[in-house]
């Protein structure tokens, strides 16, 4: 057992001091979401019928929209489904933002042969190093699954047969089935499924072990006067991979805003959601997948438009812009395919049609520069 060899004193400490032994508490993996009402499509339009995704998925009717506020009462089960289905990220949690969850799963998938995503009801014990526990597997959105599938092929869901049938979060199964199914179609890859805990493997990857071994051989003398350890070397390699991914996404956003502008014609700041950043990062990594990504965006018919401004008002990501000449333009990168603009347009000047997802691909400047240099040579 490589893990036991890496940390031989862990079990000894727990046996000597029972108070130090961790106890599984499902509440540790759950978190009540908070709302940024300024992003809500219903508050922006003063119409609760414009978007009902969070209300529809909530099994306890804990979410209400009152005037300009999104309210979450104490009946909330802390399942996280509302944040997963909200297109504008109005609802979110501090420990389970899309990029945080991506980093957590990517860190595990990079270090272990197999990464397991599961829920508190399924596991019922302290998770091992390669087990990511959520309040509900439906807490992961379609976009997050897509981003993970483009980068890793060793992610599985662990759910025993029938576990969802007895769950009070009755909308959870349908939510994760839809999210994973769509992500698999887009990524042309699949998420594994494990139903038997006895069949789960907890081995570190060969690359991770190799980095520890090489560090041990090279730095054996240095470790006498420093804190460098073989185990730390493997962790540092994984951390660098995650850090590089974050830097790549941040740089991609900078390039996007430089190309199309970070603000609308009325000087309002556009918002690129974390989920959309992950999708665009995945497409930058593998542009060939763009043709499989099925998203919608509003198409504008100027002959029907009265320039009332309702569409621009309801678009909280500011993807849609209505200029002083009465022309509507849509920046697809910022459009979350919510359809709210088309719903509030009484004249039918906006209709939702398939988006040209090629527009979501932001060329990597470094890669393009290297390609240009090779072409000259």
Residue ranges and their predicted role:
Residues 1-32, 38, 42-47, 84-198, ...:
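Flanking helices and flexible, charged tails adjoining ferredoxin-like Fe-S electron-transfer domains
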Residues 1-57, 115-120, 200-206, 215-306, ...:
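Ferredoxin-type iron-sulfur electron-transfer modules and their immediate structural context
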Residues 47-71, 77, 81-99, 310-327, ...:
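Iron-sulfur cluster-binding cysteine motifs and their immediate structural context
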Residues 61, 137, 202:
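Glycine- and other small-residue-rich loops at beta-strand/loop junctions that grip anionic moieties
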Residues 336:
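Extended, alpha-helix-rich binding/interface surfaces that flank or overlap catalytic cores
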